[in-house]
């Protein structure tokens, strides 16, 4: 789910910061949030259904690049259910897209504490750590990324994106034969997850042992 987008202009406003900036809301914003919560409770048979609805809309805003609105919606999800994995996951993805890697790590980490078996989110967490490494930041290293991806694959061996990222990590570690092995694991599971530009880089270092990519 992770993809880098430009930062929004309203990020300094608390309602558009993750978890409302971790500060008490002003009276106007608090009243608005309370009204929304009341409206959700009246509109759905139970709060879980309301949380599900708001989460789905929030993810739509993420896909449209409307990060301010997505953040506010995920904040509302958290206000409705402080244990919502979707809230932490969504806010973590937004933080990553805003290039706030430490913030993304903190939020995704909290989501994984709530649900440590969520393989897809763990891959997102690993991608943030990998981005730290690629930008020479001290918030991630290849060994850590590889361990996270291995854990994600233990949770779900069919996670094609995890195999693709494992291939990229092996490439960066100059383990090209292993990188090809992981690449083909991804290919066997889901062709849409293959990074064909990466395969060109890999072929420059070592021909495909299976002879499929030339």
Predicted regions located by residue number:
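Alpha-helical adaptor scaffolds
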Residues: 59-63, 85-161
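Terminal, low-structured helical/coil segments at or just beyond the last alpha-helical repeat
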Residues: 2-5, 13, 42, 160-214
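Conserved positions within tetratricopeptide repeat
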Residues: 71, 105, 139, 146, ...
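A conserved position within tetratricopeptide repeats
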Residues: 41-44, 78, 112, 153, ...
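Alpha-helical segment of the N-proximal tetratricopeptide repeat
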Residues: 44-79
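Sec-dependent signal peptide cleavage junction
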Residues: 1-47, 212-214
């Amino acid at each position: 789910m992770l993809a880098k987008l430009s930062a929004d202009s309203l990020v300094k406003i608390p309602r558009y910061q993750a978890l409302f900036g971790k500060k008490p809301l002003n009276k106007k914003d608090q009243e608005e949030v309370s009204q929304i919560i009341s409206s959700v409770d009246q509109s759905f048979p139970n709060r879980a259904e309301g949380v599900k609805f708001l989460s789905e809309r929030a993810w739509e805003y993420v896909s449209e690049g409307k990060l301010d609105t997505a953040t506010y919606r995920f904040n509302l999800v958290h206000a409705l259910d402080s244990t919502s994995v979707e809230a932490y996951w969504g806010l973590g993805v937004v933080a990553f897209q805003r290039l706030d890697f430490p913030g993304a790590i903190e939020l995704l980490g909290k989501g994984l504490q709530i649900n440590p078996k969520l393989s897809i989110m763990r891959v997102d967490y690993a991608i943030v750590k990998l981005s730290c490494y690629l930008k020479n930041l001290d918030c991630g290293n290849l060994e850590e990324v590889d361990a996270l991806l291995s854990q994600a694959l233990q949770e779900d061996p069919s996670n094609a994106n995890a195999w693709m990222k494992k291939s990229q990590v092996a490439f960066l570690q100059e383990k090209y034969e292993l990188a090809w092995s992981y690449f083909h694991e991804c290919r066997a599971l889901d062709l849409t997850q293959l990074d064909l530009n990466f395969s060109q880089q890999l072929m420059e270092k070592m021909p495909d042992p299976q002879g499929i990519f030339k």
